[in-house]
Each structure stands twice: as structure tokens, then as C-alpha cells.
Design a protein with these regions (language model features):
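Active-site and adjacent substrate-binding regions of carbohydrate-active enzymes
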Residues: 436
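Short, small/polar-rich motifs associated with maturation and membrane association
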Residues: 1-339, 344-345, 350-353, 357-359, ...
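Surface-exposed loop/interface segments of Gram-negative outer-membrane beta-barrel transport/assembly proteins
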Residues: 238-285, 326-327, 336-422, 440-527
């Protein structure tokens, strides 16, 4: 009986091995090894070409001699892709497939902005990333910088701790972590004018954004561009009848999940289960997160008009945004105006243009200071046993119950307002002197005014505030003047040799933090 069982088991195992061998043989015969060489139209090998079986992750890459090898079934499709060349798809019907890729003329002839002028992408040897308007992020963004999030390799954007702020910290890969603030920031250029604030540009007015890195940025703009350059090109008017465009959106923000905190009833049940008495239980069951937060709404409107003739074109736009914060007492509103006009003369050899940008931003915020006077901390740590107001209608302030101030008191009695006014005007001239030789001149003036208002009412719980209220106002003004003139010579000889020379002069004067500050207190009333 035992011998019969062993013999049957051996026969079953032999059959299983035979089936596995046949299956592996079938797969081996189904998978063809395809080899070949990928070249350009002149026959030069192309290293680094991606060879991929369409619809799968099965792929390979060409070596320094343009050769590749890949296992793929007959009848499947191979895709050959390489930067600057059009992608080819070939159905596998033989074991050797040699491919000649054609240059993507559209991609190579794409014009990119490099600072003092522009070049076709095929002539650029440095790292430049271009993001067109239709590829920018879509959403309720307060800063144009946020439109680039996730679009540029190595670009990190950190939003201000105030969610309604128009300021975002930007760093490009390679910037030193030992520095902070403006020392980490890239250099901004708007419509060819260096050092222009991004707050003067409405996201809807952006045509494209070019990001320059490595030696190109420093060679053009010097050490101030050591962290890279972000070049913003705005939309311009075109010849034709006037066109009016209106766009708008409405959005809502809400905190999806808060920290899980003990309610007052949870705390009382815990005390009862563990046989201890809670001191300072005022019978309330306050959800401070719910009291402090809200559903916030944002609405944005943009109106633009553009048009022109064969000689003259113009563009004007107005953008208005109003954004609430999810924390009560926080909000911002912003108004941006822009006007541009350009005209041609001397048989189109002379181009004159003027540009004017202005913005006003108001930002209301709440106390986010130290451990005891932060609304964000207090809404999580203030005792749920305490009501919002006492029996007399005053904000509760029970020393010993919580080390924080009443968060609703800080929102309503400690007020912070920040206003920014910015204006920038530019005049440009460009003259084609002879074939290939062009003269350019730019004059720019930028004025930025900052106002900080801080008012603590007589009902403020802050210990440093005087009995009858305290107010602080600070204002500063920054001025920037820029004049640049340069000659560009760009000539191609015999359709093969290309010569480019740039000679220029740049002057810049900046005055920062010119202002005053004042603190007053002991008011008659809070009006």
C-alpha cells in the first residue's frame, strides 16, 4: 500500500514538472529578443533614447553607441522617445529594428526667454524650464509663485504661516540651507525688468514663466541671481478689434479634520472613572475649535481689454480677490491694475512701450505669538469646561484653568492689519540699427509702501496691554530705480555659423525701510 502511494505521488510530481517546463518554453518562445541601433537623420548614434513597450513598463535605454536590447512579443508596439525628437512607434515583426529619429522642429524652434533677450531652445545649452499659462496650477492662489508648485524640478514653495498672505518662500535646488529669507530667494524679472515684485502680477495676466538655473542666471544678472532667476512674461495686446475678457471663480475652504481633543463630558467621565475631582469646572461644554473656525469663502474677478492696430497695441486689466481665512478674524482683499501700450515706428525698426502696474492689498490676521498668546494654540488647549463668556457677558479669563488666553478674546480684542501698496512703471525702447544689431533701453521705477496697524482694545487679556487699550502703527517705504541699455548682435552666416554678442550697462538704486513707528495707549474709548 505504501509503495503504491509513493509511486502515484512520484508520477504526479513528474507531470507537474513537465507542465511547468512546457509553460516556460512557451513563454521563452513568445518573448523575442529585439536589438537595434537608434540614430538621428545623419546616422549619428543617439545615447539615452527611451525604448518602451507601449502600454507597459517593459523598457530599455540605448547605450553610448545608440544600441538597445529588449524582450518583447511579436505584434507588440515599441515606442522610441528622445528629448528634441519626435516619438516613433514601430510594430515588432523582426528581431533587429534600427530606428532613425527626426528632430522635433516645433520644440527646437520654441522661443525661451533668457533675460536680456530670447533664444530658440535648440540654441540653449543651460537648464531652462518654461511653463506656459495653460500648464500652470489652477486654484485659489494668492501669489503667482504658487502657480509653479510641482511644475519645475527642484523648486520648493513654502506658503507663509498666514494662509491669506500673498507671500510665498521659494527656493531652487542648490540654494544654501545656511541662509534664510530673501537670501534663499531666486531673482524675479517681470517683462524684462529685474527686481519687480510678483505681487504686481495677477495670475490671470501671466503668459509664461521661465526658470533659469546654473551659470546662465549668474552670467546674466550677477551674484543677486545666484539662487536662480524666475522670468515672468505677461499677456500683451494684439492687432485687431478690442476684445473684452471676464473670468471669475468662487471657492470655499473648510478644515476637513481637527485634532481629536477631549470634550468637557469626556473629561468629567474620565475624572469620575478615576476617582478624582476637577477644579474650576464651570459647567460648560465648549468646542473651541468649532468656535474659532468657519467655512471660508473666496471670490476672484478679472476683467481685461486688449486690441490694437498694425502699429499700436494695448492691454489693460483689473483683478480683484477677496479671501476669507478658516480662522475667524482673518481675511485679505487685493486689487491689481495693469496697463500696457506698445507702438512701432520707422518701418517697424523702432518699438516703444510703456507699462504701469499697481496693487493694493489688505490683510487682517490674528495673534500667533508666543506659547500663551496664539489663537492656534488656544483653540486646542483652552479648557472645554470654560464658557466663551461669563455671566456678565465678558470674555472668560480664568487664571489657573488654562495657561492660554481666551481665543475668541484674542480674535475680537487684539486686531492686526497689514496694508501694502505697490506701483511700478516701465518705459522701453528697442531699435534695429542694422541687420542683426539691436539697441535696447529700459527705465523702471518701483514704489512699495507698507503699513502695519496693531490695536488692543480695553478688553484685551494681554498682560502687556495698558488698561485703556494700546495701538501701534508702523510704516515703511521701499524705492527701486533701474536703468539698463544694451546692444545685441545676433547673426547667422551661411545658415550654419551663428554669432551672438551682447554689450550693455545696468544701473540700479534701492532705498529700503524708510519709515517710522509709533505706539500710543490709554484711550478714552475703543471707537
Amino acid at each position: 500500500m505504501l509503495n503504491v502511494q509513493l509511486k502515484g505521488k512520484r508520477t504526479w510530481m513528474q507531470s507537474l514538472l513537465l507542465v511547468m517546463f512546457l509553460l516556460s518554453s512557451t513563454l521563452a518562445f513568445a518573448q523575442n529578443k529585439v536589438t537595434g541601433t537608434v540614430t538621428d537623420k545623419t546616422g549619428a548614434p543617439l545615447p539615452g533614447v527611451n525604448v518602451l513597450e507601449k502600454g507597459t513598463t517593459n523598457g530599455s535605454i540605448t547605450d553610448v553607441d545608440g544600441k538597445y536590447s529588449i524582450n518583447v512579443e511579436k505584434g507588440k508596439t515599441l515606442m522610441f522617445s528622445y528629448i528634441g525628437f519626435t516619438t516613433r512607434e514601430i510594430v515588432v515583426n523582426q528581431n533587429v529594428i534600427n530606428v532613425a529619429l527626426q528632430e522635433d522642429l516645433q520644440a527646437l524652434d520654441e522661443v525661451v526667454v533668457i533675460g536680456y533677450g530670447s533664444m530658440t531652445r535648440k540654441d540653449v545649452t543651460s537648464s531652462i524650464t518654461t511653463v506656459k499659462a495653460d500648464k500652470l496650477n489652477v486654484g485659489t492662489y494668492t501669489s503667482p509663485a504658487q502657480l509653479l508648485q510641482g511644475k519645475v524640478p527642484g523648486l520648493t514653495i513654502t506658503q507663509s504661516s498666514d494662509p491669506n498672505s500673498e507671500y510665498s518662500s521659494i527656493t531652487l535646488r542648490g540654494a544654501s540651507s545656511l541662509r534664510g529669507g530673501e537670501a534663499m530667494e531666486p531673482y524675479y524679472v517681470v517683462d524684462g525688468v529685474p527686481g519687480v515684485s510678483l505681487a504686481l502680477v495677477a495670475p490671470e495676466d501671466i503668459e509664461s514663466i521661465d526658470v533659469l538655473r546654473d551659470a546662465t542666471a549668474t552670467a546674466i544678472y550677477g551674484s543677486k541671481a545666484a539662487n536662480g532667476v524666475i522670468i515672468v512674461t505677461t499677456k500683451k495686446g494684439k492687432a485687431g478689434k478690442a476684445t473684452v475678457t471676464y473670468s471669475a471663480y468662487i471657492a470655499a475652504d473648510k478644515v476637513m479634520k481637527n485634532l481629536d481633543m477631549m470634550t468637557a463630558d469626556d473629561l468629567r467621565a474620565y475624572a469620575k472613572a478615576n476617582n478624582f475631582t476637577i477644579n474650576n469646572d464651570f459647567g460648560a461644554n465648549t468646542d473651541w475649535q468649532k468656535e474659532v473656525q468657519r467655512t471660508a469663502f473666496t471670490h476672484n474677478h478679472n476683467v481685461s481689454i486688449s486690441g490694437g492696430s498694425d502699429r499700436t497695441s494695448y492691454t489693460a486689466s483689473i483683478n480683484y480677490m477677496e479671501k476669507q481665512g478658516v480662522i475667524k478674524g482673518t481675511d485679505m482683499d487685493r486689487l491689481i491694475g495693469r496697463a500696457f501700450v506698445q507702438t512701432r515706428a520707422l518701418n517697424d525698426r523702432l518699438i516703444l512701450s510703456m507699462n504701469l502696474n499697481a496693487s493694493i492689498t489688505n490683510n487682517n490676521s490674528v495673534e500667533t505669538g508666543g506659547d500663551n498668546n496664539s489663537v492656534y494654540d488656544a483653540m486646542n488647549y483652552y479648557s472645554p469646561l470654560v464658557p466663551v463668556r461669563d455671566e456678565n457677558g465678558n470674555w472668560t479669563n480664568y487664571v489657573g484653568v488654562s495657561q492660554n488666553y481666551n481665543p475668541l478674546s484674542m480674535i475680537n480684542e487684539d486686531l492686526y492689519h497689514h496694508q501694502t501698496k505697490k506701483m511700478q512703471g516701465t518705459a522701453k525702447a528697442s531699435l534695429d540699427i542694422i541687420d542683426g544689431l539691436q539697441w535696447n533701453a529700459t527705465l523702471s521705477y518701483q514704489n512699495e509702501q507698507f503699513l502695519w496697524d496693531e490695536y488692543h482694545t480695553s478688553q484685551s487679556q494681554m498682560t502687556y496691554v495698558k488698561d485703556n487699550g494700546q495701538a501701534h502703527r508702523r510704516t515703511t517705504q521701499d524705492l527701486k530705480k533701474v536703468f539698463e541699455t544694451y546692444l545685441n548682435y545676433d547673426k547667422t552666416f551661411n545658415e550654419v555659423h551663428k554669432l551672438g554678442i551682447m554689450l550693455g550697462y545696468s544701473w540700479e538704486e534701492t532705498t529700503k525701510a524708510d519709515g517710522y513707528g509709533l505706539t500710543v495707549y490709554d484711550f478714552y474709548n475703543d471707537d
